[in-house]
Every structure is written in C-alpha cells, then in structure tokens.
C-alpha cells in the first residue's frame, strides 16, 4: 500500500519527500546484425530500450544485461534443518540485472534491476537519480527522485570499523601522485581484472526476511550489480561465483564484536569454504547489529589471501544501494585502499572510501585510486588476473559488455562508451583490415612484429615477454628462477626480490631502515610482538638460527628502539616475507632460515 502525505511517499528506499512520476515505455531495440545467432525464448531480453521523461525532458535508456554478473560455475548453498549442506547450480544466466546508458548522453550510466519494473539508479547530465516502480495495480507508474529527497532512516552515524591506516600523514600519498609509472606498470594497471566473489548471508538476516530465499537472492543480485558498476572504473569485473545462505544455524559465532566476527569468518573461509568452493574474495552479510557505529570491517591489502581476503557487512539499511556501497567500500580495503583524507576528491560530496556512510557514493577518490594502484604494483596479486575463456561463458554472447565472447572479435563496450578505432561497437567485429583491437601485441590495429617487447622486466627477478608476430596476445608472464641473486642483497622468489629494507619502507614509509640484529632476538620470545609464527592462536618462538624469518623490526633514522608493525586482523602483517635473505646464502622458507641451494 502506498502512503501519500502532501508530496511525500513511502518507497522501498524510505520516505521520499519530493519525486516525479513517470511511465517508462519499452521500445523495440535495433538488431545488431551478424553478431548473434537467433536466441531461444528467454524471460528477459539481452538488450532493452525504454523511453520516459526526466525533469520534463524525454530520454531514451539503453539497457544491456550484465553478462559478467555470475561466473560460469555459480552455485547456491543452503542448509537443511538437520544441518545437511545442499548445493545446487541453478540456471542464472537468464537474469534481470542490467547496466546501461542514455542515448546521446556521453557521460551517462545506469544500474537497473528489471525483474519487476525498473529499479535502480542512473547518472544523467552530472546528476544521480533513483527510479523504482510505484506498487499500483495495472499501472506502469514509476517514481524518480534524488538522494537528497530521501529522509534519513535514523541519525546514528554509520561508519567503517577499519581504524588502522597505513598513512602516517597526508604527505606520503601526496608525494606518490608525483611519481610516474613505467609503460609496463601502466599496461598492468589498465588490464582487465576479475574477482570471483562469494557471498554469505547469515541466519539472522535470513530470519529477518522471513526465511524467503527469493527475496534475499534478488537483494544480493542487485548489490553485486551495483558493485560491478562502481568497480568498472578500476577495470575490475565482480563475478558472483557463489551465494550461501545459512538457513539452519550460523556456521560461525556471529557476534556484536565486529572484529571477532571478521576473524572467525576469515578462518571459516580458509578452512571450510575454500576446500569446497574456489573464490577470490568473500563477504559475510549479517543481520546482527554490531557494537557502536561500525557497519562493516575488512582486512587491508589482502585480496587473494586464503584467510584475509574477506569482509563482514551489516545489513543496516532498507536501501539496497547503501548496503551495496558499503560492500564495495570493504572490498576496497581488501584491494589496498584506506579511508579518504580531507584532501581526497572524486567530483561528488562523498566518495566510496569515505569513513562515514550517510549518502550513496559511486566513485573512488583520486587518493583511493593511487593507493589501490600502489598496492597492486607492490603485491601483484595473481588471482585477479584469471580471465574467463570465451568458451567458459555459457550464456548467449552480448555485444557491448566488454567480454570478447564466442562469435565476437572484439568488445569495446556500448557505442556510447567505445573508444576503440579498431572495433565496431555495433557488431563487435574488427574494422576493415584491422587484425586486432587493444591487446598488448596490438598497435594501430595491427599485430606488433615478432620480438617486440610487450611486457618489460619489472626488476632483476622478472623476464621480459616478446610478441610472436602472429598474435595480439602477450605470452604468459614468466620469471627468473627462485634463488637467483638480485639487487646485490637478496634472492629472487616468485618473481620478486624480497629485501628487508624495502619491506620496512612499505610498512612504515620512506627513510625507514632495518633495525639492528639484537632486535631480531626478540623473536626467540613470545612477549611483545616477537614470534616466528602462529599455531592454533598460540605464538611460536623462533629458534636462534631463524630469528630473521619471524617478525620484521624497523627503525627511523638513528633510533635505537626496536619497532615492529602488527595488525590484529592479519597475522602475516609485519612479518618477514618468504624468500627474504636471512644470512649469506640463506633464505626464509616456512619461517626457517635455510640454504638457498636446497630451499626451492
């Protein structure tokens, strides 16, 4: 039932005090000749167009199904009353979640659920609008409104629980903006990346939605669709690889202590989830009310880590988009981003990595982008580079979704977004006489010659890759062998040259050095921050020969204090990295200092 009070209306997003009623009309979409074979009948179309008015002006909204929303091996898991785990692989490719743009509006975008009318948000002429159906029988009426017209649900501030920040001051991040990347680094940052995302809904939230799994699924799908639009600007695709609903009992002790819940969820992911379902990142969506004002918490710079590539988020708002933005925020921490400082801007009042959640934010600040890029270049997480093969995509190909699928030669996005001179955005075929589009071994629409460098060696431990002259793809990245001397003071390990000094700088900033040897003897004890490793929550000290393979100790200038860095949410934070030199001809392996000749 719709309740009207003057110009106020109660919608799913809350009480809206000013809105416009529109009647979207579906119009026939132009066929994209030569791209797709005739499609079988489906409930939802791959592409749609709607006409309606915004501020009294007619607009045409083009929608394309978000092909990358689900991975090809997507599964759903719930639990029977007797505790049995039930996992299915439902057909989800005929879904109703779309991205889009407005005709003749270059800087426009849309994130829409078309399951039952049009619901979502869109950007038009620099303004963000929201649209949702008015629940009036036999009517196509929809409400369009701005976020400023939605009344606050309550006055309690909603914040992220992350308090540790790697920024000791504003100065280091400002300085990084002056640095320039190498061509190889730029190519790496611009490459498409993929996160196979696993979502868990706890039993408290399940009961809050009256045990209605369909309602929960739709809510989660809308959230992932929104996250996809947010991360597209960073060249990331978020593919939902699994949804798990704890329909019987919680599989961990979900509690009001947000940190404790995150730690337990990370352990559950590592020990219980990953052995049965691969994923790059997982989040727990809970109906519990966390203590204080936090509505989410995540580990920082941990993507691909078995335990710490995780976050927990409270389902704190009626607004699906607000919770989705919090999920995107927490994933941002996993991807190396910290909270925005006062000088960070994104063109709107609020950015995704703002500490407080008051209004929706859909863009990352310049600070977040730099911090994220710095993390990627430093850690080079591997799981995000797994690109799905076109033959793995089981649903019909869609021209304009940035995925090159069966029957396509290129895909540069929609005609409004495409910036390629080599690709026809309407047909997803190469232009006449073009051999390639935007791959590493493609230049001006032609294959680069054999021997052309397509991926430079990053450092002593990397090898350059060369084009073959027969393909637009750069060969697989290869490295120097482990144990090869590098940078005059280290040994190569998995393509990196782990040097203690560099690790100290990464932890504590420029000008930091490795502490004196006597500091490392603290690793023979378990008091303070000294240790070699953790086993079942218990600190294990180092043997005397292994002290330089435990906690890393750093100092500023001529300080005599033994400084260490710890994070209660990440046991590996501040530890000496594997492969680090711990003596002449010796390297760290499994927290032991061993001969480099036998280590690998």
UniProtKB/Swiss-Prot annotation:
From the UniProt record, which GO molecular function terms apply?
Answer: metal ion binding; metalloendopeptidase activity; toxin activity
- Residues holding Zn(2+): 329, 333, 339
Q: Which residues form the signal peptide?
A: 1-8
The free-text cofactor remark is: Binds 1 zinc ion per subunit.
Q: Name one GO cellular component term.
A: plasma membrane
Q: What is its main location?
A: secreted
Binding residues annotated for Ca(2+) 1, in chain numbering: 196, 280, 383, 386
Which residues carry a glycan?
Answer: 424
Q: What is its EC number?
A: 3.4.24.-
- Where exactly are the transmembrane stretches of this chain? none
Which GO terms of type biological process are on file?
Answer: proteolysis
Protein name in the entry: Zinc metalloproteinase-disintegrin-like cobrin
């Amino acid at each position: 039932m719709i309740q009207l009070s003057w110009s106020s209306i109660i919608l799913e997003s809350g009480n809206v005090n000013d809105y416009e009623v529109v009647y979207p009309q579906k119009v026939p979409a132009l066929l994209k000749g030569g791209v797709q074979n005739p499609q079988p009948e489906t409930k939802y179309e791959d592409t749609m167009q709607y006409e309606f008015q915004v501020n009294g002006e007619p607009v045409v909204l083009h929608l394309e199904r978000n092909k990358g929303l689900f991975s090809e091996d997507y599964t759903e898991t719930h639990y029977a009353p007797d505790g049995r785990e039930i996992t299915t692989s439902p057909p989800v490719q005929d879904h109703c979640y779309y991205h889009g743009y407005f005709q003749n509006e270059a800087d426009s975008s849309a994130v829409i659920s078309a399951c039952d009318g049009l619901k979502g948000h869109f950007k038009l002429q620099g303004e963000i609008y929201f649209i949702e159906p008015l629940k009036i029988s036999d009517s196509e009426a929809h409400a369009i409104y701005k976020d400023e017209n939605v009344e606050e649900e309550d006055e309690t501030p909603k914040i992220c629980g992350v308090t540790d920040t790697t920024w000791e001051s504003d100065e280091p991040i400002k300085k990084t903006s002056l640095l320039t990347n190498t061509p190889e680094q730029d190519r790496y940052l611009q490459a498409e990346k993929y996160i196979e995302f696993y979502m868990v809904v706890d039993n408290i939230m399940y009961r809050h939605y009256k045990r209605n799994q369909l309602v929960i699924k739709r809510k989660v799908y809308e959230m992932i669709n929104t996250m996809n639009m947010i991360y597209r600007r960073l060249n990331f695709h978020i593919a939902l690889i699994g949804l798990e609903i704890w329909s019987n009992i919680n599989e961990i002790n979900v509690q009001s202590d947000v940190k404790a819940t995150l730690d337990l969820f990370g352990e559950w992911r590592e020990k219980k989830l990953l052995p049965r379902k691969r994923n790059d990142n997982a989040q727990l969506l809970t109906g519990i009310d966390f203590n204080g004002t936090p509505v989410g918490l995540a580990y920082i710079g941990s993507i691909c880590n078995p335990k710490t590539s995780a976050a927990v988020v409270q389902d704190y708002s009626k607004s699906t988009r607000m919770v989705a933005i919090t999920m995107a925020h927490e994933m941002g921490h996993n991807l190396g981003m910290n909270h925005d400082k006062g000088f960070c801007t994104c063109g709107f009042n609020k950015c995704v990595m703002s500490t407080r959640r008051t209004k929706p934010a859909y863009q990352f600040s310049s600070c977040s982008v730099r911090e994220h890029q710095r993390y990627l270049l430093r850690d080079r997480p591997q799981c995000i580079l797994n690109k799905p093969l076109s033959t793995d995509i089981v649903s019909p190909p869609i021209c304009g979704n940035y995925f090159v699928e069966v029957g396509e030669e290129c895909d540069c996005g929609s005609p409004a977004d495409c910036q390629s001179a080599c690709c026809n955005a309407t047909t997803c075929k190469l232009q006449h006489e073009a051999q390639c589009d935007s791959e590493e071994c493609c230049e001006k629409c032609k294959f680069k010659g054999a021997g052309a460098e397509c991926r430079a060696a990053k450092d002593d431990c990397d090898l350059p890759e060369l084009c073959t002259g027969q393909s637009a793809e750069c060969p697989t990245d290869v490295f120097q062998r482990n144990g090869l001397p590098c940078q005059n003071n280290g040994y190569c390990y998995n393509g990196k040259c782990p040097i203690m000094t560099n690790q100290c700088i990464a932890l504590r900033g420029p000008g930091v050095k490795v502490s004196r040897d006597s500091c490392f003897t603290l690793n023979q004890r378990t008091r303070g921050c000294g240790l070699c490793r953790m086993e079942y929550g218990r600190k294990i000290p180092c043997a005397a020969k292994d002290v330089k393979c435990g906690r890393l100790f750093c100092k500023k200038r001529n300080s005599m204090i033994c400084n260490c860095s710890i994070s209660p949410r990440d046991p590996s934070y501040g530890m000496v990295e594997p492969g680090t030199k711990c003596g002449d001809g010796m390297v760290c392996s499994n927290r032991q200092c061993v001969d480099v000749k036998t280590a690998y």
